[in-house]
Amino acid sequence: MKKIILIILIFFTSCKNPNTKNKDHSESDKDIEYVDLIGDFERKDLTKSPYDSWYIENYDNYELDVETAKKIKKLINRKISIKVIMGTWCSDSRDNVPGFFKLMDYLKFSDRRVELIGLDVDKKNPNEDELKYDIINIPTFIFYKNGEEINRIVELTIESIEKDILKILDGSGYENAYYGF
């Protein structure tokens, strides 16, 4: 019953589809046309205007659970890689991706083992990654070990990014918010 209520809540609060182009007013004297990152992109793209207005602030303000991060550090290794499918327009992506990268930095997990893929407001891109990776909501963090998917975090964390990743890596039975649907 709790899962059904959670799913209904998530459904009504999930990423809305805003206009694909809007204005970012973080710069004082001029407006910047906002264009979403679509397809493959690099982490450094998030630190450039106009994305830096939310990425840097959310990265800096994220309070890392160091105790859990230390446990993850013992489990994460070169056999692990991660795909992050997100939308720069999506509030859940804006909230969760910077904290994810703060954790990856703490773990000294190489950016080369994290692949970033952007989707548009319809949760699509020209490469059809939404179909290839069976994306239902974003952000989606897909964890691979030796190239095989082991689990994924979909849209929202169940406990926290650290605790959810720990459960994925230690095999203690992590189920994302959409598991079984």
Named regions from a protein language model:
Residues 2-7:
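Sec-dependent signal peptide recognition
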Residues 13-14:
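C-terminal motif of bacterial Sec signal peptides marking the signal peptidase cleavage site
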Residues 21-77:
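N-terminal leader/targeting and pre-domain segments
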Residues 75-106:
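Local sequence-structure signature of Cys/Sec-based thiol-disulfide redox active-site neighborhoods
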Residues 83-88, 111-125:
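Thiol-based oxidoreductase modules, predominantly thioredoxin-like and allied folds used
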Residues 117-137, 168-169:
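Thioredoxin-like thiol-disulfide oxidoreductase module
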Residues 143-179:
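Non-catalytic, surface beta->alpha helical segment in thiol-disulfide oxidoreductase systems
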